[in-house]
């Protein structure tokens, strides 16, 4: 049986037009546009806007999951696009790369950092993940669980037993991978910023969501707190986007994915945080 370590990225050079599936629209609050959007992937496996400027002075790579990816937000209006536009408007010649990939865990992002990102020699990395970590930390197998998203190894799915659920959340491995990620950046002289994942709250949509997914809400909030504590304890710069966005439901189409208004708002907040 052939196995290989999973590199969590879009296939380089991909060009795709896609619309949100009906199932996703049904689960959203109505602010997810049903229109088709273009997804263009660079030769480095990043989601990007083909109309962005070619010239830049510094390279910032934002690594994360589907929240960073913003695949159903139009080109030029994604979270990272707005951050780059805002930095350029303030006189900073920056390229802000979208290294988001749906389902990425901190283990997978650490592998991508070491195998792919380091030789690019970026000036800065922004790490923003946690949604899938929140699913992994409830199992004894944790970040090595055999699920489609979590498994760091690509292998056949035959014969994998259901993961054993823990009586309480275990952040041990996640905290160590955050430390490994941060230490790797320090060793290779790359500035690291870590951001929390903005979450939604305080509206009828969330009342319905929590009625079905309350435990996930608790897990994701706990992961954000784990991120805050790690940054505080290890001297890593934190941009607390969860607190800055302030759970405002206008900026999400579900619990944590940005609609176009949210991508714009959070992108401006990210740029402001990078300049602080």
Language model regions located:
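Short, amphipathic alpha-helical "lid/cap" segments that border enzyme active or binding sites
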Residues: 106, 110, 171, 175, ...
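Membrane-embedded segments
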Residues: 47-121
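Histidine-centered active-site loop/cap adjacent to the catalytic His
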Residues: 34, 237, 252-276
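N-terminal secretory targeting modules
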Residues: 1-61, 74, 120-123
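Loop/turn elements at helix/coil->beta-strand transitions in domains of secreted/extracellular proteins
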Residues: 58, 92-94, 121-125, 186-192, ...
């Amino acid at each position: 049986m052939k196995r290989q370590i999973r590199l969590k990225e879009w296939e380089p050079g991909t060009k795709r037009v896609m619309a949100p599936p009906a199932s996703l629209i049904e689960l959203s609050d109505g602010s997810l546009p049903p229109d088709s959007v273009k997804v263009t992937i660079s030769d480095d496996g990043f989601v990007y806007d083909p109309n962005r400027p070619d010239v830049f002075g510094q390279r910032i790579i934002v690594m994360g999951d589907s929240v960073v990816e913003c695949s159903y937000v139009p080109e030029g209006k994604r979270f990272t696009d707005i951050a780059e536009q805002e930095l350029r408007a303030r006189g900073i010649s920056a390229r802000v790369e979208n290294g988001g990939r749906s389902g990425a865990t901190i283990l997978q992002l650490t592998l991508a950092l070491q195998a792919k990102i380091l030789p690019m020699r970026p000036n800065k990395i922004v790490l923003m993940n946690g949604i899938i970590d929140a699913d992994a930390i409830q199992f004894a197998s944790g970040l090595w669980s055999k699920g489609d998203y979590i498994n760091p190894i690509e292998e056949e799915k035959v014969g994998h037993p259901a993961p054993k659920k823990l009586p309480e959340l275990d952040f041990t491995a996640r905290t160590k991978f955050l430390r490994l990620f941060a230490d790797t950046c320090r060793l290779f002289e790359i500035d690291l910023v870590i951001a929390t994942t903005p979450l939604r709250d305080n509206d009828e949509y969330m009342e319905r969501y929590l009625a079905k997914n309350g435990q996930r809400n608790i897990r994701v909030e706990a992961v954000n707190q784990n991120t805050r504590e790690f940054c505080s304890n290890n001297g890593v710069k934190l941009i607390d986007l969860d607190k800055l966005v302030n759970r405002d439901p206008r900026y999400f189409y579900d619990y944590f994915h940005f609609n176009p208004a949210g991508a714009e708002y959070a992108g401006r907040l990210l740029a402001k945080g990078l300049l602080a």
